[in-house]
């Protein structure tokens, strides 16, 4: 439906993340097709700044966005979004799992992880309301 498509587009628009996502300092799209993009993202948190590269697969027919980690401070990063129709609009399954190479960074982020995810999801919700209205 229309709602899933709008929200899919919002999440797929990685280049605009710095406009609304906390801790996202910059995003540069290296290459982009209808089904794949490669992006460099700079995150800053508690005085720490890191850049990473990811390959984002856009599976629009099935409503799935998958992120594959390419390069940066992580040992691994797995992330996906699944958009499903729902009577009240759209149900979104968001999954993220990662580990930093640096033990210090990992310890810092573990303390703030739940709040960070909550704020990130809140930022996407606020952006959706800003662009598309409250429903």
Where are these regions (language model features)?
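Hydrophobic ligand-binding cavity/cleft-lining segments
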Residues: 1-34, 88, 123, 134
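Short amphipathic alpha-helical signal-transduction/dimerization elements
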Residues: 15, 113, 117, 121, ...
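Glycine-rich portal/gate segments that line the openings of hydrophobic small-molecule binding cavities
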Residues: 18, 28-70, 123, 135
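Residues that act as N-cap/strand-start positions at coil-to-secondary-structure junctions
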Residues: 23, 50, 61, 75-77
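Conserved beta-strand residues within beta-sheet cores
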Residues: 26, 53, 78-80
